[in-house]
C-alpha cells in the first residue's frame, strides 16, 4: 500500500503488434534492461511440438530470460481465453513478488486484453442442449453456416471470431440465446477497467515492408522444416483440434489432404499471414490505448525503454 492506504497496482509492460514486426527481439532487450521476465501473449505458442509455424521463441533467442506460457499444452488439448487469463495473472503476481517486471509480448489481442482488463468469464448461464444443436449444425451444414447465424445476432463478435473457431462462435451464440445480450456488449462493459499499471507499446512499420517480411518469414519456415513439423502432427492423427486451425498449420494440412498443391499451400499461408497482420493492427487500434512506435527505419529500443521507464516510473540497468 502507499501512504494514502491505496493498494498499488502491479506494473506490467506489454508489447503488441502484427506478426513478423520484431516483437521477440525487442522484448528480450527490454527484459535485460528492466530486470524483466517475459510472458507470451500468443495463443498458439502454448502448444508443444508446434515451434516453426508459430515462430516460437527459441532457447538461443531467450538468452537466459525466463519465458512463461510457452509449451504448456499438447496440440490435441483445447485452451480457452479464461484459462489464459487465470494463468497469466498468476505469473504477473509471482514475477512481481520476485521483484521483477512482467513483460507480456504477443499478437493475440483478445487474450492480452482479457488479462489487463476486468474481463469476467462465466459459463454458468450455458445451455447444453442449445450448444449441442449448434455443434450438430456445424457438423452437418458447415462452420460458415453457424458463423452466419452469429453475424445475424452479434456482428461485432462475428467480425472478431474466425469461423473456424467453432467453439467460440457457438459460445457467443449461446450467450445471446441464454441472456439476450451480445457477447460483444458484455466485453465492451469490461473493456474500460484496467487492473494493472500498464505501459502498452505497439510496433508498426510500413505495410509493404511488413508484408515482405511476412513472405520471407514463410520461406524461412519452409526451409526450417515446417512441412515436416506439420506432417508429424498429421501422422499422429491430430484432426479438428483448436491448435491446427492456426495459420501455418491449416494450410499445410490442406496439402496433406490433397486439397491443394504444396505451392498453393505456401501461397495461401503467405496470404493468410498478411491478412492476419492487417486484422491484428486494426483490432489493436480499435480496442486498446496503444503508444505506437514505427520501426520501419530500424529498431527503437532506446526510445521505447525511455518511454516505459517514464510511464511505469522505473529505472533500467542502462540508466544506473
Curated annotation (Swiss-Prot):
Region described as Interaction with substrate tRNA: spans on this chain: 42-45
Cofactor(s) the protein needs: Mg(2+)
Listed EC numbers: 2.5.1.75
Domain of life: Bacteria
GO terms, molecular function: ATP binding; tRNA dimethylallyltransferase activity
Binding site for substrate: 19-24
Positions that bind ATP: 17-24
Keywords (A to Z) from UniProt: ATP-binding, Magnesium, Nucleotide-binding, Transferase, tRNA processing
Positions marked as site (Interaction with substrate tRNA): 108, 131
Catalysis performed (reactions): adenosine(37) in tRNA + dimethylallyl diphosphate = N(6)-dimethylallyladenosine(37) in tRNA + diphosphate
Single GO biological process annotation from the record: tRNA modification
Family that this chain belongs to: Belongs to the IPP transferase family.
Assembly and binders: Monomer.
Function: Catalyzes the transfer of a dimethylallyl group onto the adenine at position 37 in tRNAs that read codons beginning with uridine, leading to the formation of N6-(dimethylallyl)adenosine (i(6)A).
Protein name per UniProt: tRNA dimethylallyltransferase
Species of the source: Bacillus thuringiensis (strain Al Hakam)
Name of encoding gene: miaA
